[in-house]
Amino acid sequence: VVEPLSGLGEGEMAEVVWIISEADVREMLGRSGFLYGEVLTCLLKNPVRQLCVYKIRRRVVAIREEYTKEILVRRML
């Protein structure tokens, strides 16, 4: 099942399937490590600051919550 990254909870893992953002945002997300096939772990969701923190490979990346709705993922069991 493919769903937006925003649905992932803290501690859950997923594989990036598709990014449905505009080209400039997609490029920025790609530079941050959000690429097709990458496995990531949700480390923190902070609704007050509207930030989400993910671990991708050995990197820890924070992105705006709005972008997590444009990254489609498949949960890992």
Briefly describe each language-model feature range:
Residues 1-77:
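Compact, glycine-rich, soluble single-domain proteins
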